Amino acid sequence: MAPTLARPSLSGVQFILSSPTTTCAATSVVTRAIAARSFSTTRSARDSVSIPPDSPNYIKVPEPPQSSEVRHPFVKGHLPIPRSIFPKKGVPEKVQSGYVNRIAPKSAAELAGLPPKSKQESWRRKMAEARRQSLEAGLQGLWQRKVKRDQKQAKESKARYLANKRAAQAPERLDEVFTRATIRESTAKNTFVPLDPEAFVKAEEARIKHAEKEAMKSEARRDAVVQLYVASKNFIVDEKELEEHVNKHFTEKIHNAGLWESGRSIWDSQKNPISMRELRNEFSGFNDRVTATTSAAVKTTVRQKNVAEELTGGKL
């Protein structure tokens, strides 16, 4: 077993420190002896934790051996919400005289003034009378509590309303006036936004315009549905038609056109893309082609189709 470390005696330390002939060497020896610690490389919590001056633990305050704090035990669950037995307005019937006698009437023998026939009947009459008195006292107490609670709530509500009203109508505080940023009069006039006198008229116009846009969108959706319905007659619905279309379009001779069938691309089987010259001619109404798409006959046909679509209510 390893020998224990020598520790200085408290009486000897106190004597050395209180002695007027204490030298620096003796003081340093005692200090080193007091500061002697165990042979460990782990820093203690006191060395690693630094308590700031703003912490309440910076100054050690002695605590009593028994705390005077009263800690209430935690109660599980919750209290049920009491049922409202009185109406919100008016004096209820339950607090009026004669209510208890109507809901808990006495027996015919008791009303006739006949004495009880036995001790058990006497005890029953006594218990019934006690229940009537308890019921009446309970109803009166609940009613008085409700009246006081309503008066307290009304008083607090009125006081809160008056306080809010005074705060809303109170003049500006001096601290706000003195600390407010300075705004020049010219700047205030230039940045002031007056109320628009025609705000409601503009809002009504905007509402009408929005309704027109929504009607146009609805009409466009309806036309799209009708156009889809008309185009559904050309939809592929079985495998036989799908196979015919695949064999027709996915072939090496699909672009063959002309007398010699020498087409190699889609521009050979169909017309060339429109050029800037053709766009300019179409805009001016002039075209040198034999089958002009901007001729009067073509335009008339397009107009007739549009009129027919408007009359029938759908795409053609």
Curated annotation (Swiss-Prot):
Give the main localization category: mitochondrion
Query: Where is the region Disordered?
Result: 41-71
Q: Where's it found, cell-wise?
A: Mitochondrion
Q: Which parts of the chain are coiled coil?
A: none
Ordered alphabetically, the record's keywords are: Mitochondrion
The answer to whether keyword Mitochondrion applies is yes
**Superkingdom of the organism of origin:** Eukaryota
Q: What's a GO cellular component annotated to this UniProt protein? A: mitochondrion
Q: Family per UniProt?
A: Belongs to the mitochondrion-specific ribosomal protein mS26 family.
Please describe what this protein does. Answer: Component of the mitochondrial ribosome (mitoribosome), a dedicated translation machinery responsible for the synthesis of mitochondrial genome-encoded proteins, including at least some of the essential transmembrane subunits of the mitochondrial respiratory chain. The mitoribosomes are attached to the mitochondrial inner membrane and translation products are cotranslationally integrated into the membrane.
Q: Under which name does UniProt file this protein?
A: Small ribosomal subunit protein mS26
Instruction: Please name the source species.
Output: Neurospora crassa (strain ATCC 24698 / 74-OR23-1A / CBS 708.71 / DSM 1257 / FGSC 987)
